[in-house]
């Protein structure tokens, strides 16, 4: 995520624009939120930006590739790159603060906080959810692979982390790692779950994607299980286009065009489920679709926002757009995304890049 296969990048230009019948108002920068997550020392930027609210006073943020060091004169100094980190956001008296956490090697050097128990590969955190007092979090297992510069990695599986004490400091978490069996990784096709989670009545809906070799577009997939039973993999069911099947091979795409990271949540102001993601492959456009059901059918896409960072340089791209429901309101959604550069040097030399960045989108109330 800090670096990506740039020879495949397709940047799509355009101005922000909404259809006249769109339920959304024009997106605006949420600088008041973005500024909370910036720091000039220690933790100095990350992507990923998945969050889980564990109480009214605390939200956990899970980051993928993370920079540590200092920021001076708009540059990152003494930079160290690790594979993941955790932010703890606490709310008090209408204000919020964020403390960042990462791991250490036996030599005392900075390292990722979440590490595979067998020591092979690394984790990028994806969607998580509270189940009673326990937090469950999907971790995409990654490994090094042959490939062009910036693309020397591959998916190696998905692990479910069960954290028994998420209210404690992250470095003291008790974490159980469970291999997710509902994964298919082949030379021509891969299927992964954990991109998004949505709880509706008695079910937890777990979203993922199918990706075919050579394809630019990922296809949205959906599984479900009983509420608070994500780790009971034998009970998972997969949407097959008209109903639910226990067989992963029966899963049918809900739509084509999602990113690996996206969000699905019910929005009271819309009285519908909302899907938000970055359009196409590394497009600067964040788009939305709506549905009356968690499985669709989904509406035509509506462009919510074109990330301004792509205008700074041809070396800059944006991705990872998703709703943060814990920061959103009935008639306002808060969306986060990441802005990156095509080289590590580009990120090091421009400290405007590679922070959790937020926008707010007002919703026109539905009668």
For each feature predicted by the language model, list its residue ranges:
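Bacterial Sec-dependent N-terminal signal peptides
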Residues: 1-20
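Beta-rich carbohydrate-recognition and catalytic domains
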Residues: 17-44, 53-121, 130-186, 200-257, ...
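Beta-rich catalytic cores
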Residues: 45-47, 122-125, 191-193, 258-260, ...
């Amino acid at each position: 995520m800090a670096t990506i296969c740039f020879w495949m990048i397709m940047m799509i230009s355009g101005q922000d624009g909404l259809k006249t019948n769109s339920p959304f108002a024009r997106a605006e920068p949420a600088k008041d939120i973005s500024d909370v997550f910036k720091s000039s020392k220690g933790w100095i930027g990350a992507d990923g930006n998945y969050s889980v609210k564990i109480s009214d006073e605390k939200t956990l943020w899970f980051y993928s590739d993370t920079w540590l060091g200092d920021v001076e004169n708009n540059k990152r100094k003494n930079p160290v790159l690790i594979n993941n980190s955790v932010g703890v956001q606490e709310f008090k008296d209408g204000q919020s603060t964020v403390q960042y956490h990462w791991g250490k090697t036996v030599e005392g050097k900075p390292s990722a906080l979440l590490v595979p128990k067998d020591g092979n590969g690394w984790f990028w955190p994806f969607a998580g959810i509270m189940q009673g007092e326990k937090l469950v979090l999907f971790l995409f297992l990654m490994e090094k692979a042959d490939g062009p510069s910036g693309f020397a990695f591959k998916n190696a599986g998905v692990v479910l982390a069960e954290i028994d004490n998420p209210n404690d400091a992250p470095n003291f978490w008790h974490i159980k790692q469970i291999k997710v069996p509902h994964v298919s990784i082949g030379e021509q096709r891969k299927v992964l779950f954990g991109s998004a989670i949505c709880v509706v009545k008695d079910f937890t809906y777990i979203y993922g994607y199918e990706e075919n070799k050579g394809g630019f577009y990922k296809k949205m997939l959906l599984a479900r299980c009983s509420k608070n039973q994500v780790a009971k993999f034998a009970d998972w069911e997969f949407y097959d286009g008209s109903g639910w099947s226990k067989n992963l091979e029966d899963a049918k795409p809900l739509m084509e065009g999602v990113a690996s990271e996206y969000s699905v949540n019910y929005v009271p102001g819309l009285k519908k489920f909302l899907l938000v993601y970055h359009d196409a492959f590394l497009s600067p456009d964040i788009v939305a679709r709506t549905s009356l059901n968690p499985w669709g059918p989904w509406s035509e896409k509506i462009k919510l926002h074109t990330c301004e960072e792509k205008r700074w340089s041809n070396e800059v791209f944006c991705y990872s757009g998703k709703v943060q429901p814990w920061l959103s309101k009935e008639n306002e959604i808060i969306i986060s995304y990441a802005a990156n550069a095509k080289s590590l040097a580009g990120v090091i030399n421009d400290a405007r890049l590679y922070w959790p960045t937020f926008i707010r989108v007002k919703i026109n109330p539905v009668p």
